[in-house]
């Protein structure tokens, strides 16, 4: 029996990507107001057995988010720039991604460690709690700053549209704008909740590493090498939370991550909801069209 699949997506520039079991569809609103779409079959790496294995699936999802995320952002950016006759070069996007990853590790992992190291803290646990609070504070300030940018505000609104659409679909209501707009712009499986979970888990994991009383440089190396491990653990927490979202204790644990979504989502307008609905509808059609021949053969 095939396990239940949870649809999800990502907001992009003037659009939304929705991911199915074996397909993903990106729908973007062109400068002239028309919608354009791109549906692709997902590589086997993102749909095979590795994506079902605990811990390993978290790393696969992380790779998928980075690689496919860059591709769909490049697609949406090029659609948005069509009117100006410009195009985003692929190599520039990958260079930007590499720089962003290095900057993210430096700002969210190296900087908090360096700052905390300047404070005379003897307790291993307290040291890592302070470091974790600094890391979380930096992340919140970062979100506040980028949310001031007009283009990012629109991406956050598409993020809200994506959540509303998935929530409506999971509730079994028709995928129509008037029905979808009534649903919440927060979702338990959101990447924002995942990031918050990772930041909290980092405190626990780094505290365990600190028991060995490593040098500053060893702690720094551990911060970098353990990022994939913490991400894998974070995915398992979100995966468990999504499957037990009705449990009050689970919802209480996930509440801070849901709160964080108030910073990464905005109330979408009808046009943005229309884009999200189109993306989910197209990927559902792609999934159904693939299953139909197999059913006919039986």
PLM region spans:
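Membrane interface segments of multi-pass transport proteins and intramembrane proteases
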Residues: 80-87, 114-130, 210-221, 240-251, ...
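A transmembrane-helix-recognition feature enriched in membrane-embedded lipid enzymes
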Residues: 54-80, 240, 244-263
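Alpha-helical transmembrane segments of multi-pass membrane proteins, especially transporters
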Residues: 97, 101, 127, 131, ...
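Multi-pass alpha-helical transmembrane bundle typical of ion/small-solute transporters
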Residues: 43, 49, 62, 66-91, ...
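Hydrophobic alpha-helical segments characteristic of transmembrane helices
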Residues: 77-123, 127-149
